[in-house]
Amino acid sequence: SRGEQLEAHEILKAQMMAKFGADQEMAQKFARIWDACAEFDKPVSSQFKMRRKRADDFQERERIFGWHFTNYSFHNIYDDIDFYQNERRKLSDILGKKINEKNIEVEKDFGDYTQVIDFPTFLLHVLAIWEGKDTNEVQLDDKKLLALFDIKNKNKTWIIEFSEFLLKIKHIFDNYIVRNSNMDSSSRNKDEWFLQKGTYYEYQPNGKAKEHYIVEERFTKNTFSDSEINKNIILLQSMFAVTFTANRDSRWLYEIFQFLFRHIEELNDQEFGAHFKEFLEKMAVTYAEERLFTEDRRIKKYGAIPVYAFNFVDYVLWKNR
């Protein structure tokens, strides 16, 4: 039919929703998860309602991501998502890009930023992690999105489990992968690479002791409390991002995803930042060796030296400043 043509990831969403049949509750909850992840320029946690006062009952966000939004190992999250029984949504709304905002509170302080990949490529990364692919096996051509997912051979249980996994990886992505700021703000400058995470805050309005504590999730605090480690990780990740700019060249990111997923239970540990930095430095050296030297271990001549080598040297000079 005439009109706007659906993108491949929207068709994929429709194929998955079809697996729920007449089960409107599960279909609606699936759509909530998918839409939250597809709002790619916003932290996924911000797309779920949270309590406004400390004395209130936990809402979706706390139930899924934990009190301080640091839970990455959640399971059975369909039980934690609200179902709006009388909600009526047009098919265009369900398949479209805008999440239903009447049931969520949207923070304003996460700013405007650009991710290192787009949503279709992210889906391919998540699928490959889900299937346990090695780095050399992962396919990142978004034209193959529908074929790689092969939904006709998947059942409802697979869709539910994959959507939970998708949300898990998006939450990790939001907090542990660099982004590039599109605007100046109190916590970052335009065009600056940054690594910040959602953080729990509570305060009493106007500093009055008798007032209820207001609670918020703010997105302006560095992911790692050690500023030197946070800066190192930003420089290492951004070095890969500015070298391999095409979505289909983001295997470097897949290696990082694999590492983060393997260490999902350690992400909140105090020493994890140093462990993560060490992993990235070893990865950077490996990439440099593969690109700086010929097969007989000689340094490549000027015309054959790839861009990555210059970016790597910049990092080494910064570290040894």
Q: What feature does the model see in each segment?
A:
Residues S1-R321:
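Flexible coil/loop and intrinsically disordered segments
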